Amino acid sequence: PEGIIEEDGKLYLVNSGFGYDNRLSIIDINTFDKAENIEIFQNPEKILEAGDKLFIQGYGSNDYNNYPYPVVLFDPTTKTYKEIGKGVYMAEHDDIVYVIYSETNYADNTSTHTLYSYNAKTNEKVEKAFVQMPEKLKTSIITMLSINPENGDFYIGAGDYTTNGDIYRFKKDGTFIEKFECGIDPKAAVFID
């Protein structure tokens, strides 16, 4: 499994199978009986919950040169899903899912980014940037998106996979706060009380 969450007494696991699997496994926590498997898209990677809904992101293919990067909304009641957009990174805060879709040109290590959010309570997709990116970040290779659960601050990591990366911090309203150096290829921020 690539990602796992708990929702309403069940574990939901996305199975990528090294790019060849397409299943969402559902396990009852009380019995831990054999998993129910639902076919979704190929090569899922992340799963999260917002507003009692499940959001799944992944590669959508095992063809490295042709990933469609779907982000889908999964309905646990009907066991169906619908695509809400493309995304490489997603995070949730206050029942809003924030998504970054990036296209990278590895010849010159530059990227272009599309940002949007999805309100799980109203089922509204907002197709505008949720942070005010500094100029350097607009073309950097983004490697992570995390949100501080206490105050809603966004943390976006960027790097080139060979030198130390940078973390860009934004207020909940998207205002840029600071940039600081971190290790190579930042993947997540962990928040400790």
What is each stretch, according to the model?
Residues 1-193:
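Predominantly soluble domains enriched in secretory-pathway, periplasmic, or organellar proteins
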